[in-house]
UniProtKB/Swiss-Prot annotation:
The gene is trpB. The keyword DNA-binding does not apply. Its EC number is 4.2.1.20. One of its GO terms (cellular component) is cytoplasm. This is Tryptophan synthase beta chain. GO terms for molecular function: tryptophan synthase activity. The lineage of its organism: Bacteria, Pseudomonadati, Pseudomonadota, Gammaproteobacteria, Aeromonadales.
Length: 397
């Protein structure tokens, strides 16, 4: 029997191998106990402040929206230690693992940011860790592979399937099933079997809580919308969580349209997929007519995922949040524009959210609106991917 509701409406659940059920229940109990433990919370907050660098700033874009009446604020998770929002919940889960007496950590990673966050947390807390990463992503994200190894992590390239994030997830689950007694799996997004979606949301919710306090101080009112990219959906649910009850604030999660939805080469399961069971949960899932998981595509390794966290599926199903999509090219354009006009190089993942916010501003230039974009990570890891794409266009001399 679970202590917390494992479902979000019809989405979520614990569809895991029987051997893992006691482990998931143990994790849930440890999380519930830790939430009510002042010592745990004090240690977590201390690490977030003194080690990770919270709170992160809320930055008004000075140049990006000239010619419109929109104000775009960036929630600067790119300035967090490790370079992305991933560090928040990894510190929380690593502390939970220590609390449970686990002596080994495993994780999956796509863009490498979750792997880097796991590696730094394990170095800090003296835990050995193994990171599973698709072989394609290892090539796309060489700087992050080096960073992980520099901090002592063992990085395992995964050659199965499309050699991307979903394949890394599968390998991590296999490892956990075989080694659950001494190993904790730090799942990198707000997806997977209960209690992971809830744990990750709660360890990321400070993003939205800080942003709410900061925007009230800056503008004296709440934003008209908060915008975040969605792969599995951890940065977005961290931003959305505190705003869900604020009915006047639109929640906009931006999925990757890849080469275009019509091509089939995308990673937009909410808008263009059916319900299915994947990675231990019921959610929207890209699958063919036989129910097999289809390959997703995005120029952004961190969004290259065929499913989505169950709370996002639920928020979409009840109409509380909208999930438009942005193509690779639109994300590349936004990446360049923020770099050129504000001096901030965003992650390609975050560039999807920014691209949609710019569409909102420019489609109604006379509309006075305040948008908060979650700048979930920095773009250092993407410079080679972007350089290759721009050379292909002849955009770089």
């Amino acid at each position: 029997m679970t202590l917390l509701d494992p479902f979000f409406g019809e989405f979520g659940g614990m569809y895991s191998p029987q051997i893992l059920m006691p482990v998931l229940l143990e994790l849930e109990k440890a999380f519930v106990d830790a939430k009510d433990d002042p010592e745990f919370q004090a240690e977590f907050q201390h690490l977030l402040t003194e080690y990770a660098g919270r709170p992160t700033p809320l930055t008004l874009c000075r140049n990006l929206t000239k010619g419109t009446k929109t104000k775009i604020y960036l929630k600067r998770e790119d300035l967090l230690h490790g370079g992305a929002h991933k560090t928040n919940q990894v510190l929380g889960q690593a502390l939970l693992a220590k609390r449970m007496g686990k002596t080994r950590i495993i994780a999956e990673t796509g863009a490498g940011q979750h792997g880097v966050a796991t590696a730094l947390a394990c170095a800090l807390l003296d835990l050995p860790c193994r990171i599973y990463m698709g072989a394609v992503d290892c090539e796309r994200q060489k700087p992050n592979v080096f960073r992980m190894r520099l901090m002592g992590a063992e990085v395992i390239p995964v050659h199965a399937g499309s050699s991307t994030l979903k394949d890394a997830c599968n390998e991590a689950m296999r490892d956990w099933t075989a080694n659950y007694k001494d190993t904790h799996y730090i799942l990198g997004t707000a997806a997977g079997p209960h209690p992971f979606p809830t744990i990750v949301r709660e360890f990321q919710r400070m993003i939205g809580e800080e942003a709410k306090e900061q925007i009230l101080k800056a503008e004296g009112r709440l934003p008209d919308a908060v915008v975040a990219c969605v792969g599995g959906g951890s940065n977005a649910i961290g931003m959305f969580a505190t705003f869900i009850e604020e009915e006047g604030v639109r929640l906009i999660g931006v999925e990757p349209a890849g080469h275009g939805i019509e091509t089939g080469k995308h990673g937009a399961p909410i808008g263009h997929a059916r319900k299915g069971i994947y990675l231990g949960m019921v959610s929207f899932l890209m699958q063919n007519e036989d129910g097999q998981v289809e390959e997703s595509h995005s120029i952004s390794a961190g969004l290259d995922f065929p499913s989505v966290g169950p709370q996002h599926a639920y928020l979409s199903s009840i109409g509380r949040a909208q999930y438009p999509s942005v193509t690779d090219q639109e994300a590349l354009d936004a990446f360049q524009e923020l770099s050129l006009r504000e001096g901030i190089i965003p992650a390609l993942e975050s560039s999807h959210a920014l691209a949609h916010a710019l569409k909102m501003a420019r489609s109604e230039p006379e509309k006075e609106q305040i948008l908060i974009v979650n700048l979930s990570g920095r773009g250092d890891k993407d410079i080679f991917t972007v350089a290759n794409a721009l050379e292909g266009e002849g955009a770089l001399s």
